[in-house]
Amino acid sequence: MFCEHPHVFTYGSSADLDTNLKCDPAKVGAELVKVNRGGDITYHGPGQLVAYPILNLLAKHGGNGPADMQAYVHSVEQLVIDTLTQLGVKNAGRFNGFPGVWIEPNSVTPKKICAIGVRVSRGRTMHGFALNVSTDMTFMREHIVPCGIADYAVTSLLEEGIDV
């Protein structure tokens, strides 16, 4: 399922709102919603493509154990990287230690362009990814610390010179 949300901040079970929420959401025209995924706070809003793949995941090594979450996240990242490459983004990739898709991940100034937050229950995926297309980045830069990552910037396709 693909969608574009109205202004909303969502946060998962490991969120540190005292540190990473820097505004009163109502005062900036956004909702604040707790969701049943891991991770910290993120923003969804106009100009952002959000995808919620609903899939049955295979168990690790083909057995009857838990789903291979790491392989799933890796495949979602690769899907986004391949799509960005087709759109003309030449420097998208993975940034070691941080999920999602990044621009110039091997530079001293990597920028996150796509957040990924998933959960698996009974072998089925929930939640997904959020790709910043023409997003108002003010919501991420001034109102929250996106995904609890203060040391690195966020960006959008539009800011990277890609107008789709």
Model-derived segments and spans:
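N-terminal lobe of the biotin/lipoate ligase/transferase fold
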Residues: 1-110
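A generic structural motif
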Residues: 56-61, 122, 160-164
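Short conserved catalytic/interaction loops centered on acidic-Pro-aromatic/His motifs
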Residues: 91-94, 126-127, 138-144
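Histidine/acidic-rich helix-loop-helix segments that form or flank divalent-metal centers
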Residues: 113-116, 121
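Conserved phosphate/anionic-ligand binding catalytic regions in large, soluble enzymes, centered on
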Residues: 121-135
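A hydrophobic, small-residue-rich beta->alpha segment in the mid-to-C-terminal subdomain
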Residues: 135-164
